[in-house]
Amino acid sequence: MKLSDMQLFRGLEEDDISSLLSCLNSVKRNYKKGEVILSEGSIIENIGIVLSGMVMISCNDIWGNTSILGSVAPGSVFAEVYACIPGQPMLVTVSAVEDTSVLFMNVGRVLTTCTNACPFHTNLARNLLTVCAHKSLQLSQRILHTSSKSIRGRLMSYFSECAKHAGSNSFLIPYNRQQLADYLNVDRSTMCNELSKMQKDGMVEYKKNRILLKD
């Protein structure tokens, strides 16, 4: 994926982006599968942009239970909220689901016009606001998916959203079974049993991460 195709850089040409990244002192870093990128409790000043791979956002309670809050695909941004609030410790952990490359940019430089008066800062700041709005929407979607009292209701709410996004009744989800259970805030074994029942009832078919919603 080209940088100009990413939401954060929308409206900018590749040459403009190269100049902008130099101005922002951006840094590219690579992470192995399972490696922690940002830890809960960290205080950060940088926005992360996934260039390749996949990132998972999670949090742990004091008993060690993990909740999956979402995933971040190539072209998407993470940690922007914490970077924009000075001194705010992170409430989540960010880790690499697979080998992942991340571009980091200092949020202060993004939001403040540099001495070179780069004309691209306004576009970038506007795009960042749009990104934050989309993240708020994603959080609202998770609240919607977990509002049902039944596991079947939570699964169908999430699968319905995925199907709409894919434009097809057949789609891939970014989670394994444990991660999906954590995302929907349900027990993994109970969820897997419910999935089997849904398949027997002719509601869905599934194989690993491929889901098919039946008519």
Give the positions of each predicted feature.
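Short phosphate-coordinating micro-motif centered on Lys-Gly-acidic
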Residues: 36-42
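Glycine- and acidic-residue-biased ligand/ion/polar-headgroup-sensing regions
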Residues: 34, 45-58, 74-75
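A short beta-strand-loop-beta hairpin characteristic of the jelly-roll/cupin
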Residues: 55-67
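Cyclic-nucleotide recognition modules
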Residues: 24, 68-126
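Short, small/polar residue-rich loop motifs at catalytic or cofactor-binding pockets
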Residues: 23-24, 42-44
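Phosphate-/nucleic-acid-contacting segments
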Residues: 151-154, 158-215
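Cyclic nucleotide-binding regulatory module and flanking cytosolic helices
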Residues: 1-33, 82-86
